[in-house]
């Protein structure tokens, strides 16, 4: 059974529109924060990946479906898990919930690239540390 990464956020006034509803683009910020915290959970940061491996993790594509709205002062949980891995990328699913209610479902394709934006192999330490969070397939 795979593990999940969890990250909690609180909705602040700056996150909302005039009606007190989270502005749609801000969910992408929440998802990015959760991915950054997932790296931290396995003992790495984006800066370390750049310094140690000369690589950056970029978003190649993002599919997001808005199921419900979040509002000012809501407490949200972002659950993230790895769907599949290739030599140079991985696919992550992320779900934002408020209690039992799903607010957002997303599928993110992340690619490791060098400083010239060319794909590079996922560093072995990242692959190994993410392994408990894989839920579907590995294509190496």
Regions found by a protein language model. Give the residues of each.
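Terminal targeting signals and extreme-terminal segments of soluble enzymes
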Residues: 1-77, 85-140
